[in-house]
Amino acid sequence: MTQPTPARRLDEFKPDAHFAWCVTGSGHMIEESIDLALRLPRCDLFLSSAGEEVLPLYGWPMKRLREHFKVFRDNSASSVPVGMLYNGDYHTVVIAPATSNTVAKCALGISDTLPTNLFAQAGKQCVPGIVFACDTAPSVITQTPHEWVEVRPRAIEFDNVERLARIEHTTVAYTLDDLRAALDRRLTQLTLAWNTSSS
């Protein structure tokens, strides 16, 4: 078995490199996730088609998103934005929140959406990835656009999360606090700090 390749050195990224924050079709903690993205220095959004459909239901239509972020949409079969990873434009890929579908694809090496393609290419470039998996507890209380509901993930969802956590250069966040802590550690590594305001 080969030894894992070390993470990409910080001096291999551009001085003004960004976070690449991917949004999938989950509403679980989506508002809290976007709030964290707003507080990061230099953060761009990458939306799956489902993510683009879901965000307006939680108060984030495209117009509002573009007031705060540079936004990339999943409308290109070639996923052209992925090439920016190779140029050192992005030092970290975040998927938050990540649906069970996205987690399964990432865990199995399937890259047929903008977020999953970014994740796969980041791994091949030894760029750290942080994935906030939604289905990580026997019972998950989550907010839909109209009400709170209980979701009971299946064994296969737990298996996929465990499989994902074993992939090189990947940190799986099981809770919002885990996500915040993983971002905090990455900011420290990059000698960056949270923005004091998310407005």
Language-model regions: role of each:
Residues T2-S199:
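A cross-family phosphate/adenosyl-ligand binding-site feature
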